[in-house]
C-alpha cells in the first residue's frame, strides 16, 4: 500500500492525527531531502531525493509499495501542488497496480490565511507562479482572469533567486488593475515554521519598494492578494463573507 501523506508545514503540531498514525505504522518513508528533518523523529527508514527528482521519488515509492507499506510525504496537502496526482499517473502508466490512499494535510494557503486573519473567507483562486511545468503565458492569463473576476488570489511559489519573471510580469498586470483602487496584500514567509515572518501591506507599497520585497519573498512564501472587499481590522487581513451587508446586528 502506498500512502501519500500531507504533513502541513512540517511542524509536528500541524501533522493531522491520521498522518501521524500512518507514518508510525509504515515500513518506509519517501520524501524530498529537505523534508527529512520533519519525519526523522518517527525512527523509520527514509529514502530521499532532491529537487526536480519527483518522478524518481514517486516511482521508487510505488515499487517499494508492492510488498510493503510506504508513505510518500508531501508538505502541505499532497493533492494541492503535491505528489498525489503523479503517484496515480505513474501507477497507471507503468501498470504497478499498487493500492493508493491519500492522507490530507493542512495546505499553505489555509495556514497563511489563518495567520493573516481571514482573507480567504470568500471566493478565492490559488495560482502557482512556478513556470517549470506550466507555461508563463498560461500563468499570467489565469492571474489576469482572477483579477477580472475580483477573486482573492493566493499565490504559491511566487519567486526564487533564479526565477523572477513570472512575479514581475504579474505585478505589472496588477498595476493595471490598481490604477483606480489599491489592493491589500498579505505575505507569510515560512508559515508554521521557524523564522515565520508576516507582512500585511498594500500593492502601492509593494510596487514602490519592489526591490526590497524581491529580497524578502521566496519559494517558502505565500502571497494573498485581497479583493475589492478585503479590509484590515485590528491589524488582521479580513475578507468579509457578506453577513453584515445582509443582516442587522
UniProtKB/Swiss-Prot annotation:
Keywords: Cobalamin biosynthesis, Methyltransferase, S-adenosyl-L-methionine, Transferase. It catalyses: Co(II)-factor III + S-adenosyl-L-methionine + H(+) = Co(II)-factor IV + S-adenosyl-L-homocysteine. InterPro entries: 4pyrrol_Mease, 4pyrrol_Methylase_sf, 4pyrrole_Mease_sub1, 4pyrrole_Mease_sub2, Cbl_synth_CobJ/CibH_dom, Precorrin_MeTrfase. Pathway: Cofactor biosynthesis; adenosylcobalamin biosynthesis; cob(II)yrinate a,c-diamide from sirohydrochlorin (anaerobic route): step 3/10. SUPFAM superfamilies: Tetrapyrrole methylase. The keyword Methyltransferase applies. It comes from the Archaea. One of its GO terms (molecular function) is methyltransferase activity. One of its GO terms (biological process) is cobalamin biosynthetic process. Its EC number is 2.1.1.-. Gene3D superfamilies: Cobalt-precorrin-4 Transmethylase, Domain 1, Methyltransferase, Cobalt-precorrin-4 Transmethylase, Domain 2. May also convert cobalt-precorrin-3 to cobalt-precorrin-4. Belongs to the precorrin methyltransferase family. This is Probable cobalt-factor III C(17)-methyltransferase.
Amino acid at each position: 500500500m502506498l500512502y501519500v501523506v500531507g504533513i502541513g508545514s512540517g511542524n509536528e503540531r500541524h501533522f493531522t492525527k491520521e498522518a501521524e498514525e500512518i507514518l508510525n505504522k509504515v515500513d518506509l518513508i519517501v520524501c524530498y531531502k529537505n523534508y527529512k528533518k520533519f519525519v526523522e523523529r518517527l525512527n523509520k527508514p527514509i529514502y530521499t531525493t532532491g529537487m526536480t527528482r519527483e518522478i524518481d521519488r514517486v516511482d521508487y515509492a510505488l515499487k517499494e509499495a508492492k510488498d510493503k507499506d510506504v508513505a510518500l510525504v508531501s508538505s502541505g496537502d499532497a493533492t494541492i501542488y503535491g505528489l498525489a496526482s503523479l503517484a496515480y499517473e505513474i501507477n497507471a502508466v507503468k501498470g504497478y497496480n499498487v493500492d493508493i490512499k491519500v492522507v490530507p494535510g493542512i495546505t499553505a494557503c489555509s495556514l497563511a490565511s489563518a495567520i493573516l486573519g481571514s482573507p480567504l473567507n470568500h471566493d478565492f483562486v490559488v495560482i502557482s507562479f512556478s513556470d517549470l511545468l506550466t507555461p508563463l503565458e498560461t500563468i499570467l492569463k489565469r492571474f489576469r482572469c482572477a483579477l477580472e473576476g475580483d477573486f482573492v488570489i493566493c499565490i504559491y511559489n511566487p519567486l526564487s533567486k533564479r526565477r523572477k519573471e513570472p512575479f514581475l510580469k504579474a505585478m505589472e498586470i496588477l498595476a493595471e488593475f490598481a490604477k483606480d483602487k489599491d489592493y491589500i496584500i498579505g505575505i507569510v514567509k515560512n508559515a508554521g515554521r521557524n523564522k515565520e515572518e508576516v507582512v500585511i501591506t498594500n500593492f502601492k507599497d509593494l510596487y514602490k519598494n519592489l526591490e526590497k520585497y524581491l529580497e524578502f519573498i521566496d519559494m517558502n512564501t505565500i502571497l494573498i492578494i485581497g479583493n475589492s472587499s478585503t479590509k484590515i481590522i485590528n491589524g488582521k487581513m479580513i475578507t468579509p463573507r457578506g453577513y453584515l451587508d445582509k443582516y442587522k446586528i
